[in-house]
Amino acid sequence: MAVLAFSTVDTVLVARHSATDLAALAVGSAAYITVFIGLMGAVMALGPIVGQLFGAGKLAEAGHQVHQAVWLALALALLGGLLLVFPTPFLALSRVDASVEPRIRGYLLGLAVALPAALLFAAYRGFNIAVSRPKAVMVLQLAGLAAKVPLSIALAWGLPALGLPALGVVGCGIATAIAMWVQVFAAAALLRTHSFYTPFGVPMATGTGGLHPPDFKALRAQLRLGIPMGLAILVEVTGFSFMAIFIARLGTTPVAGHQIAANLAALLFMMPLSLSHATSTLVAQRIGARDLSDARRLGWRGLQIALAIALVMGGSVFLARDGVVSLYTNDSLVAAAALPLVAWLLWFHLADAAQIMSAFVLRAHRIATVPLIIYATAIWGVGLGGGYAIAFDVGGFTPAALLGARGFWFASTGGLVLAAVALTLFLLWVLKRERAA
């Protein structure tokens, strides 16, 4: 939740600054999320690998994997930073107004500075969650948020008394970069001072003689799992973020309304995502300890809890959607554009919760290739491809109620439902096969 609060702070502040800045935020966020989440997926392979090693009691080997994840994060940050500094492909897809483009570029420049810190912290987060220390992550993320909020307010709205101009969406990008590096330095200090990390020999821990040199065997193992994981996450995220890029063609008001609905969906997603991380960690640890029966039980229990909570949260937002949207904007046109999209969130969120839990339990078993195929078919094929055809009436058959942004949300919900059903059935097959073995 602390992670998505960064985006929520930006959305609320920018929505009250100008619709043009909100449109820039929607396209810029879509570009950054596409780059960051796709790269972060490769780093996330650290979680199930360390979880199984920790469950087997191989602490030094688990720590060695963290050193390799740092090298991987730095290399990926260089690649991703180039895409953010030179965002022409994203701008070409969005076809935004000329007045919006400079603001997108300025916002992404700040996020390019934030990207190395974000990927390094992803490695820190993956390790801590894998060894059942989520509080260490939560505290630092809340500290980053505490730095982010006042910085965003000052830089986005300005402080005339101090001669600081209102930078709008660009100021939010700068604030994110500062806050992310604060998190990384705080994480390094914690690794250095807390005795828990010493037996692992992780970077910065007491007694560790610096960063281990690249171990290409370990890096290959991480990439073998991380690449399909990263691609699967990239498919899911681009299916959502490219909605914003295509909806931007409709104008600033439709994309501003979409940004509000998208931020709500992302906020709701944080609960099943957190539960999925926790469930995946416990399942991986039980697999490492060779207790497959308990691993199966934990996986199914996690899915049941995620669906129950998703029903309550999604239903609550649906019933209170008018009041929720009013918290984001006082622009009646933007609110009118957002409300029909927010109405889809109940079914969207239920499917999202089911698919992410099933995918994470499969990752605990080090299975990522089949989920990638399912994601590509359901989310790119049905969600994004179908959404484009419906929203822009490619075949001349779209009813008026589904033209524009509503068509994208209709198709994306259908794609998520298909992904959820397919992943859950595949998980059932995997568990039955393990039981038979």
Over which residues does each language-model region extend?
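Short runs within selected transmembrane alpha-helices of multi-pass transporters and secretion channels
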Residues: 43, 47, 111-129, 137-145, ...
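Alpha-helical transmembrane segments of multipass membrane proteins
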Residues: 8-12, 89, 123-127, 149-157, ...
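Transmembrane helical elements of multi-pass membrane transporters/channels
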Residues: 1-10, 110, 114, 121, ...
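Short alpha-helical transmembrane segments in multi-pass integral membrane proteins
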Residues: 50-116, 150, 154-227, 283-348, ...
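Helix-terminus/linker motif at the lipid-water interface of multi-pass membrane proteins
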Residues: 4-23, 91-98, 154-167, 230, ...
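Small-residue hotspots at the loop-to-helix junctions and early N-terminal turns
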Residues: 19-30, 104-108, 173, 252-267, ...
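Small-residue-rich hydrophobic transmembrane alpha-helices
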Residues: 22-81, 85, 121-132, 137, ...
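Membrane-helix boundary and inter-helical linker elements of multi-pass secondary transporters
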Residues: 15, 52-55, 130, 165, ...
